[in-house]
Amino acid sequence: IANRHTHLLQVVGVIIALFFQSCAAHYATNMVNTPMLKQQGDLQIGGSVGHLGLNGQLAYAVSDNVGVMVNGKQHEAWYADDLATSNTVMFVEAGAGYYKWLSEHTIVELYGGYGLGEVNLVHAQKNTDITYILSRPFLQPSIGVQADFFSLNFATRFTHAGLRSDSIQLSGLFIEPAITTKLQFEQLSAIYQMGIVRTLHTDTPEMQVLPFWLAFGFQYNFDFTKND
């Protein structure tokens, strides 16, 4: 099983490398934040690493049914190939939404928000250095189940990503389903997430899309109501 997992990571790594070596503008999403907040005052802070780079996530329960979130991403890669390619991505988004526990073990969530970022693509041999501004609103419904120390969440994020430089303007509508599992040990949780990106509509077919992602990380849960 370990060999299969290693082989999968190698294949994914090759696909990612080929993706970022392309001269075309591209859209690489960030990790989906699936907080599954319990009640007013809950605060979560987490981070992950994976094929999307470094991701940071924060979520806070404003009330027993309203939550807010802030997410960030940083990715930097350099490839010593014939093109001498480098790629740097910085992205931050904020959102708010509604959550409701249907039972002791089942929750539904709906979050929406907006993000801004910057994508810098350099091909040294081709003397190309392009910076794109990334803008992206999102809408994210999800359903989750909680059993003791284990939780499973299925989210479907809809995004409209726009990439704009001095001479290029690209955009597309995407669907980004993701499955997130969390193993909780007291207030610390280990997170694993995998997801895919599919294009719903684009007027600019030259806009490339990173088709899937894997991410691993940890999340710390602050419960300020525990001692009330």
Indicate residue ranges for each PLM-predicted region:
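Short glycine/proline- and aromatic-enriched beta-strand/turn motifs that initiate or cap beta-hairpins
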Residues: C23-W78, D82, D223
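Outer-membrane beta-barrel transmembrane domain signature
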Residues: N30-V32, K100, G115-D228
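Generic detector of contiguous secondary-structure segments
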Residues: V49-A61, V92-W101, L139-P141, P177-K182
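Detector for intrinsically disordered, low-structure N-terminal pre-sequences
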Residues: Q10-V14, G95, F216
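Outer-envelope beta-barrel architecture signal
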Residues: L37-I45, L54, D64-V66, E104-L110, ...
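Sec-dependent bacterial lipoprotein signal peptides
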Residues: I1-C23
